């Protein structure tokens, strides 16, 4: 594993991380790693979307169907 040093972290961010760590009974470092792990997963989103099959549905048709369903509620 690599070591990551963060500088210029705003005080309010540190305070919130400290509160989360206290609630989870863990360290600020563990909370920061957990949160960065979750946030970094977004980097995979374009590839995931690119791998989806094109099912040939026109977006206006799709949105029209959603609007019709919502109107029927």
UniProtKB/Swiss-Prot annotation:
UniProt KW keywords: Toxin-antitoxin system
GO biological process: regulation of DNA-templated transcription
Superkingdom of origin: Bacteria
Protein purpose: Antitoxin component of a possible type II toxin-antitoxin (TA) system. The cognate toxin is VapC9.
Entry protein name: Putative antitoxin VapB9
Protein source organism: Mycobacterium tuberculosis (strain CDC 1551 / Oshkosh)
């Amino acid at each position: 594993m690599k070591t990551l040093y963060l500088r210029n972290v705003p005080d309010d961010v540190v305070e919130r991380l400290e509160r989360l760590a206290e609630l989870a009974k863990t360290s600020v470092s563990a909370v920061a790693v957990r949160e960065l792990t979750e946030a970094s997963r977004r980097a995979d989103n374009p590839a995931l979307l690119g791998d989806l099959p094109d099912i040939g549905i026109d977006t206006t048709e799709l949105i029209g169907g959603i609007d019709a369903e919502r109107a029927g509620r």
